[in-house]
Swiss-Prot record:
Myoactive peptide. Increases the amplitude and frequency of spontaneous contractions and tonus of hindgut muscle. It is found in: Secreted. The modification Arginine amide is found at R11. Its main location: secreted. GO terms for cellular component: extracellular region. GO terms for biological process: neuropeptide signaling pathway. This is Tachykinin-related peptide 7. Keywords: Amidation, Neuropeptide, Secreted.
Amino acid sequence: SPATMGFAGVR
C-alpha cells in the first residue's frame, strides 16, 4: 500500500 513508504508501497 502507498502508506508504507510511498514508493515501496506502490509495489
